[in-house]
Amino acid sequence: MAKRVVLGMSGGVDSSVCAYLLQQQGYEVVGLFMRNWDSFLNNDFLGNEAISQDVCPQEQDYADAKEVAKQLNIPLYRVDFIKEYWDHVFSYLIEEYKIGRTPNPDIFCNKYIKFNFFAQVAFSKYQADFIAMGHYAYCENGELFKAKDDSKDQSYFLAQLSNEQLKKVIFPLANLTKQEVREIAKNLNLATATKKDSTGICFIGERKFTKFLENYIPAQPGKIIDIATKQVVGSHIGTMYYTIGQRKGLNLGGFSKPYFVVGHNLEKKVLYVANEDFPEYLLSDKLIAIGFNQIAYKFDTNNLSAKFRYRQKDIPIKLKLLANSEIEVSYNDTEAVTPGQEIVIYDGNKVVGGAIINEVFYKNQKKTYI
């Protein structure tokens, strides 16, 4: 009897091709579409252009998934995780922004929704032997590796998964490039073959970000201060709307050199900036991260690199394991390492693990202004 795989179908080209590839590998494929956000239940009105559209993007995605399931002759079911997403992903996102950090919701969406609640339904209700997702990544024996297509590799977003979760997962796109996936879809004439990739917040979609956050956090305007001269150089609409290293959207004109964001003071509602004459305010060479989730059973401590944000080039590091799942990571001068973001550590193509950046240092001094 064929093994049953419950596949997360999003209505996009990646999961559509996954369904076909799993069929070709002899699996019995069951599609499961997740609905994790409700704009009306979640008070998502400001910045949400989808409200006024004739067809909700989420409903269009479901219609596309149904069409592909029909083309491939596989069953497709629908499941709602709206409350779970709010409790485990979105609430965390808002709380992080409130304390001045820059979170990455995709990481916790994977940890709690796609590979936890989704998996529970797949295994208990639909008797799955495995679950599958359209991520560009590779796993073997509970360990996680980068995908073939480095430009699309999503192992960064999966570094909070456990070995037990990974043992029950199939990533059919591990050894394909995005172009190859598109070609397969076009050759099969799948309904999603030319559909553009989704962007925006995981399961929420594209939003006008400043207006979107105002649904949940009141905007608190304040001063923009040059951290080197201590002079007021402008005003901002709320520190939560700016990220470390940001250069655009500051509305600071009339200066000989452009400014970039280097930090903030929440209590004083101050956004700190610097120009290229003072790069040290943007640089760091050490960090402390919390909640380290080790995936690799073994790794070479002399061959480690890391990403501090998605699609960043891997940077050589030195890793020190501390107590209470904390890690200390040292590296050469690097710009815009940001608390709240995830650091993912690699041994070559193998994912060693991931943790959330908590404190950042430069020349043994903690950067207290970020």
Swiss-Prot record:
Residues engaged in binding ATP: G8, M9, S10, G11, G12, V13, D14, S15, M34, G134
Q: What is its EC number?
A: 2.8.1.13
Give the highest taxon in the source lineage. Answer: Bacteria
Task: Report a single Gene Ontology molecular function.
Answer: tRNA-uridine 2-sulfurtransferase activity
Keyword presence, tRNA-binding: yes
Pfam families the UniProt entry points to: tRNA_Me_trans, tRNA_Me_trans_C, tRNA_Me_trans_M
Which stretches does the entry tag as region Interaction with tRNA? 152-154, 309-310
Tagged with keyword Glycoprotein = no
Keywords, in A-Z order: ATP-binding, Cytoplasm, Disulfide bond, Nucleotide-binding, RNA-binding, Transferase, tRNA processing, tRNA-binding
Q: Which reaction does it catalyse?
A: S-sulfanyl-L-cysteinyl-[protein] + uridine(34) in tRNA + AH2 + ATP = 2-thiouridine(34) in tRNA + L-cysteinyl-[protein] + A + AMP + diphosphate + H(+)
Which species does this protein come from? Metamycoplasma arthritidis (strain 158L3-1)
Its cellular-component GO annotations read: cytoplasm
Main location class: cytoplasm
Q: Which residues cross the membrane?
A: none
Location relative to the cell: Cytoplasm
Interaction with tRNA, annotated site positions: H135, Q341
Name one process (GO BP) from the record: tRNA wobble position uridine thiolation
What PANTHER family does the annotation carry? MITOCHONDRIAL TRNA-SPECIFIC 2-THIOURIDYLASE 1, TRNA 5-METHYLAMINOMETHYL-2-THIOURIDYLATE -METHYLTRANSFERASE
* Region of interest: Interaction with target base in tRNA: 104-106
Give the protein's recorded name.
tRNA-specific 2-thiouridylase MnmA
